[in-house]
Design a protein with these regions (language model features):
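Flexible coil/turn and secondary-structure edge motifs
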Residues: 1-172
Length: 172
C-alpha cells in the first residue's frame, strides 16, 4: 500500500533501506543497549528485517518501566536513541502524561509515539507506513488511528547517545 502522511510526518523512500555493510545499516547495534534489551533481537530487527517486530509486549519484559516510571511521573521526558547510531529519535511523553504514554503503549503492545514526540531530523516514514531512521534502522510502523501513531520496537530505540568525541555514553 502506497500513501503519504500529513505533516509534520516526513516521508522517505526505499533508498534509505538499501543494502549496506550491515544489513540495511552501516553499523551493527550498540553492545550495551538500555533497559536490558537483547542485542541479538535488536540487531535482527534493526538491520535484517523489514516486516517483523519484537513480540507484542516485549517492552514490558525489559527494565524500561522499572527504570523510567519515576522520571516519567515526575514530568521528565525520556529520550529514545537509535540502537545503531545513538542519534536521538523520539522524546516522550510530550503533550501528554507518562501514564497516558504507558497506557497507549500497553494497549497496542509496543511503545507508541505521536507526532510531537518524533525527531523528524532523523526519522522517516516510507509509503507503506514502515518507520525508519535516516541511517537505515528499522524502527516500526506508523499505524494512524485518530492521528499518526508510531508503534516502535523498543530494541530499535534502546541505544545510547554519543559524546562530543563520538564515543558511546555508558550512563544516562
Amino acid at each position: 500500500m502506497t500513501r503519504t502522511y500529513d505533516p509534520p510526518c516526513v516521508m522517505g523512500d526505499e533508498s534509505i533501506m538499501s543494502k549496506k555493510e550491515h544489513g540495511t545499516s552501516h553499523v551493527p547495534v550498540q553492545t550495551n543497549l538500555r533497559w536490558n534489551c537483547d542485542r541479538s533481537t535488536a540487531d535482527r530487527i534493526c538491520n535484517f528485517n523489514r516486516h517483523y517486530a519484537e513480540h507484542s509486549g516485549y517492552w514490558k519484559s525489559t527494565s524500561f518501566l522499572d527504570e523510567e516510571t519515576e522520571n516519567g511521573q515526575n514530568g521528565k521526558e525520556i529520550n529514545f536513541y537509535d540502537s545503531n547510531t545513538g542519534k536521538l529519535l523520539f522524546t516522550a511523553p510530550r503533550g501528554r502524561s507518562f501514564e497516558a504514554f504507558v497506557k497507549e503503549s500497553m494497549a497496542h503492545g509496543w511503545p507508541s509515539f505521536r507526532d510531537d514526540e518524533v525527531n523528524w531530523e532523523y526519522v522517516r516514514v516510507l509509503p507503506d507506513g514502515e518507520t525508519v531512521s535516516v541511517d537505515g534502522t528499522h524502527l516500526g510502523h506508523n499505524l494512524p488511528d485518530r492521528k499518526n501513531r508510531y508503534c516502535i520496537n523498543l530494541v530499535s530505540v534502546a541505544g545510547r547517545p554519543k559524546d562530543e568525541n563520538g564515543n558511546i555514553k555508558s550512563d544516562l
